[in-house]
Amino acid sequence: FPAKGSLPTKIPAPNFSPDDFVVKLGISYAGEYSINFNSLPHMLIAGATGGGKIILSRWIIYQIVNKGAFTYLVDQKGYVDYRDLREDCRCLDTNEEILDGLKSVVDEIARRMELCRSAWISKISDYNVLPGVEPQPPIFVVIDEANCLLDTTGKSKVEKDFIAQVVQHLLTITRLGRAAHVHLICICQRSDVNSIPGALKANMEIRITSHCADKESSMTILGNGDAANLPKIPGRFLASDGTEFQAYDFTCPPGQNL
């Protein structure tokens, strides 16, 4: 394992974890750093431009789709960073598509919970191993530039009504999604009260950020000021569990979509 102060700054992406719920993120001082969406179902990734959050988010999407997850993707920048990854995601572009897509996810959570109730079990992962049933794949909703989608500052009443509906669907997903194997990943440049509602952020157990300009910015994401002391190294992140890690440097294989 790397000694303190000697994390590499460029680490090629490895093979996937064999475990369905486990996604590899990078290398920490204790070794490989992974997260398990079974126990920590929802994630917030924050960081300024150039911090490496797009490379990390692309690597996460690449893993979950290759593990068989049905992935909804929302990108307010027009998928510039996801051109090679979007073919196997359902991309939600217009406001109508976003609301319809999120509602379908909420409806799917309800359907899966009814399957569980009918089988006298509490979560869809237990349902999937029952004999004779059709396994229900994991579902991920990935929102890049979440602050652009959710910030109500300067918005019209119509726009605020749209945002309120989006937030309500996202809150439902984060409150009920775990047992249904439905997960939310939000990626943003900042995470203040205007860009990510506090109730939504509180439901996102995994929070990760690159270097923050000040302790106040770090506080809004992690609940402490530690990210202000993080080195300004592209791909260097601090997680809400206190782990500092260098994200894997991922490039989609040439000529290969997901």
Where are these regions (language model features)?
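P-loop NTPase catalytic phosphate-binding loop
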Residues: 5-121, 137-214, 222, 227-231, ...
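Conserved AAA+ ATPase small/helical "lid" subdomain
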Residues: 230-258
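Short beta-strand segments
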Residues: 33-35, 131, 243-245
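Conserved alpha-helical scaffold flanking the Walker A/P-loop in AAA+ ATPase domains
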Residues: 104, 125-133
